[in-house]
Amino acid sequence: NHKSGLFVNGGYTRNNHGGWQGDLTGREKRWHPKDQALMNGMFGFQNRNMNVWYRLDFLDEKIFGPNNGSELQPEKVSDKDFLTKRYTHQLQSDWKLDNRLDVHAALSYQDYKRRTRTTESDLSTGEKWLSSAEASQDITQYKAWIARATVAWNIAPEFSVQPGVEYQWTQGEGGRIDGTPKVSDLAFFLSAEYKPWEWLSLRPGVRTFIVADYDAPIAIPSVLTKFKLTKHMDLRLSYAYGFRSPTLQELYFSFHNDNHDIDGNPDLKAEYSHNITGSVAYRVLHSEKIHLTTTLSGFYNDFRDKISLAQNVDIPNYNTYYNIDR
């Protein structure tokens, strides 16, 4: 039996935290007070062969940063608050064309905006006004699109393939971002599963970039294998060629306050890695009421040009992102 028709649901969560002063005194708090609201709504339609839905998630967060005044003017204080709004839209659909062919499509858009609001106050009179100091008022905004489509095709009982295409686009702007940069790529991927015998399963895969705003490898391969050694013991071995391009934040975002001085590095290169994992699982006990399994696993990772945060070699006490050779 499969239910058909429209469906709707939603949720609301409110988190309030008064902060924690810790070893600080006066108005200052080690953990800043926070007021956070999370809302979501979803509606869609489904029947035996199709499921289509849209979902909206909304975050409204206020982090308050009260400070003490100076020793000479304790009544004059400067407070810094962080106001964040984030909208995430998701549209997804699944179609079952027949017993051997399924199609999946997804589209997502996120709009993130964070405002830094600095206010000056006179505690003796209650007067309050916005600070006019440099960089005291700031808005940072990120927008991101992700579109993805895949096909699951069961060609035979022992063989299936999953081709797909994915597009990603991200843009940032604000007083702490150098210009209005964007990063985008269009990639094609293909994975398969082959079970020539009951005791062996092979899952090869490859991803290639058709268009990219950065240097990308021609192909990113991976392979997963599973060996059924006995009725109660499995061996899994896998290899994956890792690739990660630098994010907008790592490339262009600058963040400076009393505790941090971090600058982006537009000269970053993508990082690469070779990743090997293996595990042996043994089912010690398997009954209707009790399942007991023990697993021994290991891994080996070899990174090249790994992106890491380190001290700026040109400016003391400042940090930036660098590629570590190995």
Label the model's feature ranges.
Residues N1, G41-F45, L91-W95, A147-W153, ...:
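Residues on the lipid-exposed face of transmembrane beta-strands in outer-membrane beta-barrel proteins
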Residues K3-L6, N49-Y54, K62, N99-V103, ...:
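Repeated loop/turn-to-beta-strand initiation elements of outer-membrane beta-barrel proteins
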Residues K3-W20, L59-P66, L107, D111, ...:
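Surface-exposed extracellular loop regions of Gram-negative outer-membrane beta-barrel proteins
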Residues V8-G10, G41-F43, Y54-L56, A105-L107, ...:
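Membrane-embedded beta-strand positions of outer-membrane beta-barrel proteins
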Residues V77-Q92, K96, T140, Y214-D215, ...:
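Outer-membrane beta-barrel signature, preferentially recognizing the C-terminal barrel domain
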